[in-house]
Amino acid sequence: YLQGVGSNKWDPNYTWGRQVIPPENVKSLEPKLFVKREKGCLAVKKLSKKLPLNEFRLMNFKKMNGNSLDNLDINSYLLRMGREEGDYRYFIVYDNYLNILSYNCSNYYGLSVGLLSDKFK
């Protein structure tokens, strides 16, 4: 199914996404990042607006090892998972993640597939 459904095609040159460390001011950034979406399933509606990865880098989101995100101009979205403040986990996801969601539109499913696939690299 990773070959794509409809307009969502898997790009083997990129990954699905990654967990990230948010900047200290993430709460103040969220109103600008998360805008109401009219289209898409619930999982897609929970993604931030689309931004180039280098914009998340400029906002000081970091890789889990503390290094800066890559300075790339690829479509990226922020995903916030968790039930309450202080319990949130943040992920930067790419167009390949949307391909996963086109098969089963659940962020729990998408993250499970993505994180499990990382174990096989």
Give the location of each predicted region.
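C-terminal soluble interaction/assembly domains
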Residues: 16-121
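Acidic/His-rich structured neighborhood in mature extracellular/periplasmic domains
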Residues: 1-7, 13, 27
